[in-house]
Amino acid sequence: MARFQMSNLVGDPFALATVSIGMLAWIIGVVSCSIAHTKEVVPNFFWWSIAYQLCVLVGVAVVMGSNTSHIYGTAVVGYAAAGLVCTTFTLDSLVTSKQGARQSAGAGLILLAMTDIVWIFYFGSTSQSGPRAYIDSFAPHKEQPHSYRNSKPISHSYTPRPETTVSSAHPHMYSSAPLSGFETSSPMTGFNPAAASTTGLQPVLGSQTNASTVGGETGEVGQPTEYPYRAKAIYSYEANPDDANEISFTKHEILEVSDVSGRWWQAKKSTGETGIAPSNYLILL
């Protein structure tokens, strides 16, 4: 579980600025309305809005301090939107008042509403969006969007992807080494050795006819039918356009994996698309 670190909050200019402005606006609203309450009763809904906004402020500070915005971003958007609605309803009775303390409290709530709008836009955008990527570029501890060809996790000694032909999956299918006696390695059915001896015809091993079909089936290896593992993408990956076997995926996308023994994993997306993916871009769940 991610832990709260003050360095994440202080080292992120956006987080530090928005949380600081929100806390300052909250203090202005509470102090001003407390003063106004001594002269005139303040609606109870205002105190509920102030208490709710404090919870939103603390929640956003914890999320940014623990660097878990990619996990709780959707929840923050919902809570900030609800806080924006509460603040907007409270503003009317404060800004239109002739009392200075109430107007000051209204100014504080306006700042809170503006902060909520900024948070809704930030947390509601994906990390691949231009504005958010630009904002996150000022925070060194945040992950940046990666491209497969420009990313550092891939080393130059990365092994090639596995072959998907019959010869690699079954290296002895067309070899006569495992056989003995007068047996033939030809996968053709209906071959009669006695008839071949009388006609003088001999099977040619490794011929085009032998490798083309096996009982009417093509020589390509079928896709796996079971995907017992689930993996999460820790980086975005763009498939090589020259290789139809690779698949593209985005950061934090969940994939189903059939085998985790090699450097390239056979994966299946939620859309049903299948292909191979680099294992160091994924983490098992």
Curated annotation (Swiss-Prot):
CDD domains: SH3_Sho1p
Parts of the chain that traverse the membrane: 13-33, 45-65, 71-91, 104-124
Localization per record: Cell membrane
Top-level taxon in the UniProt lineage: Eukaryota
Cytoplasmic face of the membrane: 1-12, 66-70, 125-285
InterPro entries, per the entry: SH3-like_dom_sf, SH3_domain, Sho1_SH3
Comp. bias (Polar residues): 147-168
UniProt keywords, alphabetically: Cell membrane, Membrane, SH3 domain, Stress response, Transmembrane, Transmembrane helix
Region (Disordered): 141-170
Domain named SH3: residues: 226-285
Pfam families (alphabetical): SH3_1
Extracellular side: 34-44, 92-103
Function: Plasma membrane osmosensor that activates the high osmolarity glycerol (HOG) MAPK signaling pathway in response to high osmolarity.
Assembly and binders: Forms homooligomers.
Homology family: Belongs to the SHO1 family.
Protein name: High osmolarity signaling protein SHO1
